[in-house]
UniProtKB/Swiss-Prot annotation:
Organism this protein belongs to: Geobacillus kaustophilus (strain HTA426)
Catalytic activity: 3-oxopropanoate + NAD(+) + CoA + H2O = hydrogencarbonate + acetyl-CoA + NADH + H(+); 2-methyl-3-oxopropanoate + NAD(+) + CoA + H2O = propanoyl-CoA + hydrogencarbonate + NADH + H(+)
Assembly, per entry: Homotetramer.
UniProt protein name: Malonate-semialdehyde dehydrogenase 2
NCBIfam families, per the entry: MMSDH
PROSITE patterns in the record: ALDEHYDE_DEHYDR_CYS
Keywords: NAD, Oxidoreductase
Higher taxonomy: Bacteria, Bacillati, Bacillota, Bacilli, Bacillales
Function: Catalyzes the oxidation of malonate semialdehyde (MSA) and methylmalonate semialdehyde (MMSA) into acetyl-CoA and propanoyl-CoA, respectively. Is involved in a myo-inositol catabolic pathway. Bicarbonate, and not CO2, is the end-product of the enzymatic reaction.
Family to which the UniProt record says this protein belongs: Belongs to the aldehyde dehydrogenase family. IolA subfamily.
InterPro entries referenced in this protein's UniProt entry, alphabetically: Ald_DH/histidinol_DH, Ald_DH_C, Ald_DH_CS_CYS, Ald_DH_N, Aldehyde_DH_dom, MeMal-semiAld_DH, MSDH_GmP_bac
Domain of life, per lineage: Bacteria
Annotated NAD(+) binding sites: F153, K177, E180, R181, S230, T252, E385
Length: 484
């Protein structure tokens, strides 16, 4: 093991605890390959300890007055703001995205904490004083207990902040299993929450892989599971946790289509599509992975997209003006290369080859912006979620055809349209099968006070993340009818 490189600890019952598993994995900087830390691959027994700590803490936390919980969250928000730059740098170091994008991700995480701090309002029930003569009814919200969260590598700040602040604000306790690829940020979030005054055991972190995940899904004292990640894993999480009687929300894969109409402002469309397709190296569930070019604008649109992609600076995200950082691991880079080779083999036209960018030869896991033209819906690069800076362009003649193409996908997370025509927007809104829609913008991810998630194979469950859906997910109701 490299001298001077820390081995991370689990956070259980308010204490930093060394894993007893004896197993670790390296956490490299994707831009350089340098090992930043080692993450423990913890055992199921260690997960059980965290659940016990959370269950014990729930006894008192659930009875903590809601305004007191809110004050702790307000303090937490203040600390996150004070450490904003530190957190953004840490996101860039372990994830690889540009510092500007990491800074924005920290902002989105802080906004989630701000929403959760509104717990006194969010937890309010409803009452009707006269359902019959002398009889009244009321609905009251209560926490559900110990909640488990399983988060991905691509948003190590934002996605955990979707989960544990709101769950905790609602009176629950939480066990977080962050991605073993980006574990350092999760530990820092826990440190700051403790500094804000969060009681021991309310938030716990257990690093690991399959044993920890399965432990969360099957543990009888875990009442709900929130998951963000790939579609196959999300489906497994949903089925396994549901079979063990848990409430589940699983946000999974995506293949987001951007429809560009002939009347669109192409400069706006190109700017937004470039940001949406290649920001975060394409490793996000709201990435624009398919452009559907409608009618005669296709040639000009392709030309402008390639020209804009050629201007992007590729490199270490900590360097000034870098737009496109590396993908998360060498294996993911090689997987992306295989998709590019497959796209060529299946007959798509490769108009920009990200394998040829100079940065690809560096030590990091770089792949440049890649664009395919004349892609069809029978091609693998259209069907699969590549999760990399690869953009496919499909050509059609009408909006009806464009919507048909988008709706063929088994994924339905997001979709966008670029147009000046309100009639086009209305038709798109009514007929597209997707959960989050954008008009003349590339990433229609809603703010924390609206629900976030898609349809079809992009989501398993009933209640989405964030907004009042999140409050509903993390609470249960009691109805009381009284005669006086």
């Amino acid at each position: 093991m490299t001298t001077g490189v820390q081995t991370l600890k689990n956070y259980i019952g308010g204490q930093w605890v060394e894993s007893r598993s004896g197993k670790t994995e390296a956490v490299p900087n994707p831009a350089t390959g340098e090992v930043l830390a080692y993450v423990p691959i913890s055992s199921r027994e260690e997960l059980d300890e965290a659940v016990r700590a959370a269950k014990e803490a729930f006894k008192t936390w659930r009875k903590t007055p809601v305004p007191r919980r809110a004050r702790i969250l307000f303090k937490y928000q203040q600390l996150l703001v004070e450490h904003w730059e530190e957190l953004a740098r840490l996101v860039t170091l372990e994830n690889g995205k540009s510092y500007n994008e990491a800074y924005g991700e920290v902002q989105r995480g802080i906004e989630c904490v701000e929403f959760a701090a509104g717990a006194p309002t969010l937890m309010m029930g409803r009452q009707l004083p006269d359902i019959a003569t002398g009889i009244e009814s009321g609905m009251y919200r209560y926490p559900i207990g110990v909640v488990g969260g399983i988060t991905p590598f691509n948003f190590p700040m934002m996605v955990p902040c979707w989960m544990f602040p709101l769950a905790i604000a609602c009176g629950n306790t939480f066990v977080l299993k962050p991605s073993e690829r980006t574990p350092m940020l999760a530990n820092r979030l826990a440190e700051l929450f403790k500094e804000a005054g969060l009681p021991d055991g309310v938030l716990n972190i257990v690093h690991g892989a399959h044993d920890v995940v399965n432990g969360l899904l099957e543990h009888p004292d875990v009442k709900a599971i929130s998951f963000v990640g790939s579609q196959p894993v999300g489906e497994y999480v949903y089925k396994t946790a549901a079979a063990h009687g848990k409430r589940v929300q699983a946000l999974t894969g995506a293949k987001n289509h951007s429809i560009v109409m002939p009347d669109a402002d192409l400069n706006v469309a190109v700017r937004e599509i470039i940001n949406a397709a290649f920001g975060s190296a394409g490793e996000r569930c709201m990435a624009a992975s398919v452009v559907v070019a409608v009618g005669e604008i296709a040639d000009e649109l392709v030309e402008k997209l390639v020209a804009a992609a050629n201007e992007l600076k590729i490199g270490n995200g900590l360097e000034e003006s870098v737009f496109l950082g590396p993908v998360i691991r060498e294996a993911h880079k090689q997987r992306t290369v295989k998709y590019i080779e497959l796209g060529e083999k299946e007959g798509a036209i490769l108009v920009r080859d990200g394998r040829k960018d100079a940065a690809v030869q560096d030590n990091g896991y770089f792949i440049g912006p890649t664009i395919f033209d004349r892609v069809t819906t029978d091609m693998t690069i259209w069907k699969d979620e590549i999760f990399a800076p690869v953009l496919s362009i499909v050509r059609v003649e009408t909006l009806d055809e464009a919507i048909e193409v988008a709706n063929k996908s088994p994924f339905a997370n997001g979709a966008c349209i670029y147009t000046r025509d309100g009639g086009n927007v209305r038709k798109f809104r009514e007929e597209i099968d997707a959960g989050m829609l954008g008009v003349n913008l590339g990433v229609p991810a809603p703010m924390a006070f609206f629900p976030f998630s898609g349809w079809k194979n992009s989501f398993y469950g009933d209640l989405h993340a964030n907004g009042m859906d999140g409050v509903e997910f993390y609470t249960r109701k009691k109805m009381m009818t009284s005669r006086w």
